[in-house]
Structures are given as C-alpha cells and as structure tokens.
UniProtKB/Swiss-Prot annotation:
This is Protein phosphatase 1 regulatory subunit 3E. Keywords: Carbohydrate metabolism, Glycogen metabolism, Phosphoprotein. A motif (PP1-binding motif) lies at residues 87-90. Residues 154-259 form the CBM21 domain. Acts as a glycogen-targeting subunit for PP1. PP1 is involved in glycogen metabolism and contributes to the activation of glycogen synthase leading to an increase in glycogen synthesis. Signal peptide: none annotated. Residues 248-256 are annotated as: Substrate-binding motif. The gene is Ppp1r3e. GO terms for biological process: glycogen metabolic process; positive regulation of glycogen biosynthetic process; regulation of glycogen biosynthetic process; regulation of glycogen catabolic process. Residues 51-65 have a biased composition (Basic residues). PANTHER family: PROTEIN PHOSPHATASE 1 REGULATORY SUBUNIT, PROTEIN PHOSPHATASE 1 REGULATORY SUBUNIT 3E. Expressed in liver and heart, with low levels in skeletal muscle.
Length: 279
C-alpha cells in the first residue's frame, strides 16, 4: 500500500507553535498599536528579502510589554546621575554678546527699576536702628508754662481743686509749682510724668511750699522733674489726694508738655540721669 507524500506547504504544526500564534493574536487584538517584528525566512541561497514574516517561538521570541500608565507616548523624566556631564553654553556661541556696555552721563541719572530701588532701600534700612516715634504732645510743647497768668485761673482751680501754677524747663531739669484747694490739713500732691509718650511713666511727689494768695483759699506745692529729652517733650499731669478723694489736672485731657532741646548740648540739655532733689 503506497502512502502519498504530503504537499510541500503542508508542514505539521506542534502544540507550542499553535499556542504562540494564539498568544500573539490575543495581544494584537488587545493592543493594535504594537507592531509585529518581521523575521526573514531563510532559503537555499541565503535570506530572501520580502519574505512572509513568521511568528516567533516562545523561547526565542520577544514578549510584548504594557504601555506606561501615564498615557500613550508620555516620556518619563530621565534622572541624572552624579557622573553625568553637563554642558555649558556661552552667549557668544549663540550669536549674543558676552558683555553689555552701558554709558552714563553726569547730567543724566541712571534709570534704576522700581523693584531694585525698593530692595536697596530695604537693605539700607536694616543697618539702622528704628527711629523713635514722634513724642505725643510735641506740637503743643513749650519751654515754660504759666497757667496762673491766664484769665479764669481761679475758676479752674475752684472746679478742679488742683491747677498747675507754673513750670520751667532749664538745663538742670524742670522746676514747677501747683495750687490746691485747702480742703483738709492732710493732703498729698504728686506729678505723674513720662519722657517717651506714656509708653512708660513715673510719679514724683511734690512738697508743701506755703499758702497761695487768695482767692480762693489754697496751698502751693513745688516739684522737680528731669529735663525733657533731646528732640522730644516731657509730658506730665498733677494729682491731688485728700480726704479719700482724688483730683487731677491734665490740661483738659491734653497733658502738659515741656519741650526739650533740638540737639545735644543745646538750651535745656542735661545729663540723661540728671536729677535735682530738694527738701
């Protein structure tokens, strides 16, 4: 019994080959963008260009990989290693000038951008201490105060129970006096003052200086204060305590103010801690 020879193109296929074809068909259906790798079919005289591509054997083929999760065609940033060489480009290599020359004329000031001026001013101010704020009451300050010579002084004294009589700022300090109504034998008079616009304050007692001319019936108290600060003013108010009550004279809420010298060594200047005490 003769067996017919199978046709030349009818090549028996094993299970591994069929499984590889099935796998490639599955990946091609899921990701059509993946390109098949063509393999040249060898012939008798060598390779034939344009031959039909054949599927790879799983052991020799290249398995498809999933596309990046960030989206198709997205390139991930390449990290540089410490050994990566960096390139430096100078402006002249790009057709630019290496230096910019600017000419300034004495009669034409340079044009500095606004943001540069602000930065320069900010840097310059950091080297200086903050300026002290303008002392309160400086615009109303005087070298000498004499309320007793003003009209209506007796009426004010009768209403307030205490009034400033006079105050003078000298090179050794402030000398002043006050009048208080004689409401009782025991009475206490003091002066509350500040040299920094009431950010801090002190209180100095006044001493009895004898009876004051009538009317009305009153007593006189004298006080001493330090000299006003240079370029500032000394603010003060009078306090009167008698029979458990308290009365104030603060110049109608504006405080009394004595002006200090404009420059060190000027009129009215004194040592910072210069005090004059008397009994």
């Amino acid at each position: 019994m003769s067996h017919e020879r199978p046709p030349r193109n009818d090549i028996p296929r094993n299970l591994s080959f069929i499984a590889a074809l099935t796998e490639r068909a599955y990946y091609r259906s899921q990701r059509p963008s993946l390109e098949e790798e063509s393999e040249e079919e060898p012939g008798e005289g060598g390779t034939r260009p344009g031959a039909r591509s054949r599927a790879h054997v799983p052991g020799r083929g290249r398995r498809a990989r999933s596309a990046p999760a960030g989206g198709g065609g997205a390139r991930t940033a390449r990290s540089r290693s410490p050994d990566t060489r960096k390139r430096v480009r100078f402006p002249d290599a790009l057709g630019l000038e290496l230096a910019v020359v600017r000419r300034f004329r004495p009669g034409e000031p340079p044009r500095v951008p606004r943001h540069v001026q602000v930065q320069l001013q900010r840097d310059a101010l950091r080297h200086f201490a903050p300026c002290p704020p303008r002392t309160r009451g400086l615009q109303d300050a005087r070298i000498a105060l004499e309320p007793a010579l003003e009209p209506g002084f007796a009426a004010r004294l009768q209403a307030q129970r205490i009034c400033l009589e006079r105050a003078d700022a000298g090179p050794l300090g402030v000398a002043g006096s006050a009048r208080v109504l004689d409401l009782a034998y025991e009475k206490r008079v003091s002066v509350r003052w500040s040299a920094d616009g009431w950010r801090s304050l002190r209180e100095s007692p006044a001493s009895y200086a004898g009876p004051a001319p009538a009317p009305p019936r009153a007593d006189r108290f004298a006080f001493r204060l330090p000299a006003p600060p240079v370029g500032g003013a000394l603010l003060f108010a009078l306090r009167y305590r008698v029979t458990g009550r308290e009365f104030w004279d603060n110049n109608g809420g504006r405080d009394y103010a004595l002006l200090g010298p404009e420059h060190p060594g000027g009129a009215g200047a004194a040592e910072p801690q210069g005090w004059i005490h008397f009994i």
